């Protein structure tokens, strides 16, 4: 059991640590605007916040941390901003992977990665290769990821198996569909997020893990992502500890 001490030294027991946490990292642009800085500086500050949250989650015993780094819809942003965002994984992996590796963190990526710029793709591959034997927290980047597209592709794969008589339609189950999703590379028990956190005060999923989040608990906070640090993660988990997960039962 972990004990989280608030600033007033009130001890809060953390009986339940969510095995899989998903984070929609939102508010980088607004963070920069409040400080009269370019939007790209918010993304850079968000990168530093991610490193702190990852190490904190690892220390708490979280098994998987899936972070929404770039959606399939984000390509519609201004070209200069997209170019900067695409360079962030290169900078993040080069700067922080040695520390992640030291903390036994394994880097993994889901999404349509073949459409990424070569430098981004290569940096991602280097990080995954360097940490592939680590057995601690899985830092799972959703990069050029879209939930509807993921489900559509799973349906296409299953339909093709039926067309080729490799699969009987009566044998299609939820587990079979899940096995065709990108999260099938995660440990079986931890594929679905127990807790999804969204920063910046927005109250929507934005196409993030729609299948996997069917029974997730949600935590929405007005805190902008660059300001979401270790203490904010603890607050989210304290809130999670006050929930009773029913999974559809009474």
From Swiss-Prot:
> What cofactors does this protein use?
Mg(2+)
Q: Does the keyword Transmembrane helix apply?
A: no
Q: Where does Mg(2+) bind?
A: 26, 217
> Pfam families, alphabetically?
Prenyltransf
| SUPFAM superfamilies, per the entry | Undecaprenyl diphosphate synthase
Active site residues per record: 26, 74
- For the ligand (substrate), the binding residues are 27-31, 39, 43, 71-73, 75, 77, 198, 204-206
Q: Which GO terms of the molecular function aspect are on file?
A: ditrans,polycis-undecaprenyl-diphosphate synthase [(2E,6E)-farnesyl-diphosphate specific] activity; magnesium ion binding; manganese ion binding
Q: Which GO terms describe its cellular component?
A: cytosol
Q: How is the cofactor bound?
A: Binds 2 magnesium ions per subunit.
Answer whether the UniProt record assigns the keyword Metal-binding to this protein. yes
Subunit description: Homodimer.
| Protein task | Catalyzes the condensation of isopentenyl diphosphate (IPP) with allylic pyrophosphates generating different type of terpenoids.
Q: Which family does it belong to?
A: Belongs to the UPP synthase family.
* Protein name in the entry: Isoprenyl transferase
User: What is the species of this protein?
Assistant: Streptococcus agalactiae serotype III (strain NEM316)
> Which gene codes for it?
uppS
């Amino acid at each position: 059991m972990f004990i989280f001490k608030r600033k007033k030294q009130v001890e809060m027991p953390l009986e339940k640590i969510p095995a899989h946490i998903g984070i929609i990292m939102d508010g980088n642009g607004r963070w920069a605007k409040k400080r009269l800085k370019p939007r790209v500086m918010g993304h850079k500050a968000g990168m530093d916040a991610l490193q702190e949250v990852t190490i904190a989650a690892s220390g708490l015993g979280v098994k998987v941390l899936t972070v929404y780094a770039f959606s399939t819809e984000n390509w519609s942003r201004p070209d200069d901003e997209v170019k900067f965002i695409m360079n962030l994984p290169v900078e993040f992996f080069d700067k922080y992977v040695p520390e992640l590796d030291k903390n036994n963190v394994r880097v993994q990526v889901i999404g349509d990665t073949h459409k990424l710029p070569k430098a981004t793709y290569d940096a991602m591959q280097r990080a995954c290769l360097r940490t592939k034997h680590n057995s601690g927290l899985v830092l799972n980047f959703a990069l050029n990821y879209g939930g509807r597209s993921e489900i559509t592709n799973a349906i296409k794969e299953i339909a093709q198996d039926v067309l080729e008589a490799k699969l009987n339609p009566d044998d299609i189950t939820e587990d079979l569909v899940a096995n065709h999703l990108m999260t099938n590379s995660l440990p079986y028990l931890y594929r679905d997020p127990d807790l999804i956190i969204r920063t910046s005060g927005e109250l929507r999923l934005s196409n993030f893990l729609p299948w996997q989040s069917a029974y997730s608990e949600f935590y929405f906070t007005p805190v902008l992502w660059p300001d979401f640090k270790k203490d904010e993660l603890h607050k989210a988990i304290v809130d999670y500890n006050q929930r009773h997960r029913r999974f559809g039962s009474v």
